[in-house]
A protein has these predicted regions:
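Membrane-proximal helix-turn-helix segments that form the acceptor-binding/catalytic region
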Residues: 124-166
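Carbohydrate-associated surface elements
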Residues: 172, 192
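A charged, aromatic-enriched C-terminal amphipathic alpha-helix characteristic of glycosyltransferases
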Residues: 204, 339, 343-376
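Nucleotide-activated donor-binding/catalytic signature segment of Leloir-type glycosyltransferases, i.e.
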Residues: 250-273
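Short alpha-helical segment that forms part of, or immediately flanks, the ligand-binding pocket
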Residues: 273, 295-300, 311-315
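Short hydrophobic beta-strand element within catalytic cores of glycosyltransferases
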Residues: 284, 304-307, 314
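Aromatic "clamp/platform" in nucleotide-sugar-dependent glycosyltransferases that forms part
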Residues: 287
Length: 377
């Protein structure tokens, strides 16, 4: 799009470079392995990342000719100390006033004392008095959220005072942010499929109807985590026996039965999308997502999504005319054919649903919105 950019990330698996680091130009791995390890170890006691800053980027940014946009995304997850980031932004703005700060919020971390995902908890509305779970990401041994929440929110107010513009892919995260920091403080640009994935999807032939029993997909990074994959619901689907064929994609599947096919974790996006393309539906039961791209990707290749009630799933499905359902309804819907599922969830034919979804989740639309946003800063 003609905009020069650099991408700075914390670390990849094991504190090393990301596996895709060499695939892109102008990429910087930022956080030393020891910093990440120290943060991981100490976060469980302190409920915040103690180490990590952007200070070594100061000269690069302030010596760049012309206006600069610093666009932040996920700043938690053991690579940066929030207070250090805010102080860095103050220093940069004082030295180079034509730096603009932008922050895309991919979860609820900006409104809570600790958690990135609320998992139905609304304690943040009353100052995180007592955390109902210590396991919600990022997990801890001791709950200090109530002690930290006021100071953390003050740092976000300081970012707003520096002129930082906040964006979220989802309405429900933007609403939560605006309820604390003021109406209109966070605007919405929905996630879209990245251009490389969109090219893969364009090559996949549409599968109008599969042969045999319904093939149902469940996708998660770690299939053991109940927040992402409702374990009881999957077991109830398994209990349907030869009425369905259940396909899991992800690590550590605890599901074994005669009607289950465990594909493991697929790092090759083309292979994953090709496999999903053969499915009659994707069942989504996560309670801890914001605007999940796996839904956008499945819908874009014409695979109906059967999702249990959550703000995230509701918002994504509504964009293509779909709805969420109860767990009881899931067990009925997974026994239907692909066209019948499309009709039940999206109220239209499979062909019309596919066409509608391909347009709704286009990465090109997201890209154009961001470029327009940058150009109007």
């Amino acid at each position: 799009q003609g905009l020069a950019s650099h991408f700075v990330y914390g670390y990849g698996k094991g504190g090393k470079e990301s596996v895709s680091h060499q695939n892109y130009p102008q990429v910087i791995k930022h956080t030393p392995r020891m910093t990440a390890m120290a943060n991981i170890a100490l976060f469980r006691l302190f409920n915040r990342d103690l180490f990590g800053n952007f200070n070594e980027l100061y000269r690069t940014i302030t010596r760049t000719a012309g206006p600069v946009v610093l666009h932040f995304h996920v700043l938690h997850s053991y690579w940066l100390n929030l207070k250090s980031v805010v102080r860095f932004c103050e220093k940069v703005k004082n030295h180079k006033p034509d730096v603009t700060l932008v922050w895309t919020l991919h979860d609820h971390w900006s409104v809570t004392g600790r958690c990135a995902f609320t998992d139905g908890c609304e304690g943040w509305k009353t100052g995180c008095q007592k955390c109902p779970t210590l396991n919600n990401y990022p997990p801890v041994k001791i709950d200090r959220a109530h002690q930290l929440v006021a100071g953390k929110r003050q740092l976000f107010r300081e970012m707003l005072a520096l002129g930082c513009q906040f964006i979220s892919p989802s309405q429900h995260v933007a609403d939560a942010f605006n309820s604390l920091y003021g109406p209109g403080r966070c605007r919405i640009i929905n996630n879209g499929i990245d251009m490389a994935t969109e090219a893969i999807l364009a090559d996949l032939p549409p599968v109008r109807e599969t042969q045999g029993k319904p093939k149902i997909a469940v996708v998660a990074h770690d299939l053991r985590y109940d927040g992402k994959t409702n374990q009881q619901l999957v077991r109830e689907m398994m209990a349907l026996g030869d009425k369905i064929e259940l396909h899991t994609f992800g690590k550590f599947s605890p599901f074994t039965a005669g009607n289950v096919v465990n594909h493991g974790f697929e790092t090759d996006k083309r292979k994953l999308m090709s496999a999903l393309n053969q499915m009659d539906a994707l069942v989504f039961s996560s309670r801890v997502d914001n605007y999940p791209l796996i839904l956008c990707e499945a819908l874009s290749i014409g695979v109906p999504v059967i999702a249990t009630h959550s703000d995230a799933a509701r918002e994504v499905l509504q964009k293509s005319g779909g709805k969420t359902v109860s767990e009881e309804e899931v067990l009925q819907l997974v026994q239907l054919s692909k066209p019948e599922i499309a009709q039940a969830i999206f109220g239209t034919t499979l062909a019309e649903f596919s066409q509608r979804s391909r347009a709704a989740y286009s990465g090109q639309q997201m890209l154009e919105e961001y470029v327009n946003f940058y150009q109007n800063l």
